């Protein structure tokens, strides 16, 4: 993993403020083994073996983000070149829905969560905002590092992409189920309102 310069106060990929400590370069987040175990866990990409996850992690770099910093912004189409494996801390995922001006909390993510994987694959605008609700430590995989992984370790790169795609498909199916449930709830509520009139 590459280390960050201590004098910078912003991450060049996300434009967010990053915790910088004076002195020698920051140590790796915990260890590559810890990050690999999180990456290969059921909460992330269970399809990867621990050995494969260690190879993927070797293409990531450690980052720290201050509590309160929004490091992914919904609708941002310019800042999609990375994904994050959360190692420590919590991230609040929010979205602004139609006809609302304040964001709705979608979920709170903890260690082992993958964040931003859709953007790294399709370069489309970010679908939600992600804010560190505590100081977080994470491993960042850039699009350039992903391309290097695919070129240098094509089998593992392909397996990683399939695992990420399966995870996105799983979340899509879950979202569809929730939308159907909300549609039934809205229909029931409308019927109740119509009956009272």
Give a label for each model feature.
Residues 1-197:
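Cytosolic regulatory regions built on CNB/CRP/Popeye-like sensor folds
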